[in-house]
Amino acid sequence: MKKTKSLRKRLILENDKLFREIIRARDKVCQKTSKVCNLQVCHFWRRNILRTRWDLDNACLLTGGIHFYWAHSHFQDFQAFWLKRLGKDRYDKLELKARYVSPVRMEDLLFTHYELKKKYSNLQGQNKINLRRDVYVEV
């Protein structure tokens, strides 16, 4: 018998789907090479840090090769790129948010989901992009 996922886990996965679509719509191309194929959402602070996982300042599009090579092998260059991309103030705020240790409650996940759905709906309403229809959660 297949085990059903908890509401928390489903909400995290749905937030990931919404966030992925928002980042793809925002960046459109690899932020290092400007290529348009094999794109992946790349996080500066690890995805297991839920405080920054869905922060728009914490992600950009990179090709798979650049993501693996640059972000995971040459971290100092990657960090310099991120600092230049965000500026010192936004970078410091993101770092503070990432290093702040506290549990992420269900209410936090629900609020994040609401905010992501709002951004997603705004993108849909503006007809700027063709968003996939499979991004939906019932809470």
Walk through the language-model features, giving the residues of each.
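A boundary/linker detector
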Residues: 1-18, 37, 94-139
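Short, surface-exposed acidic
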Residues: 86-96
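Short edge-strand/loop segments of extracellular domains
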Residues: 46-49, 85-86
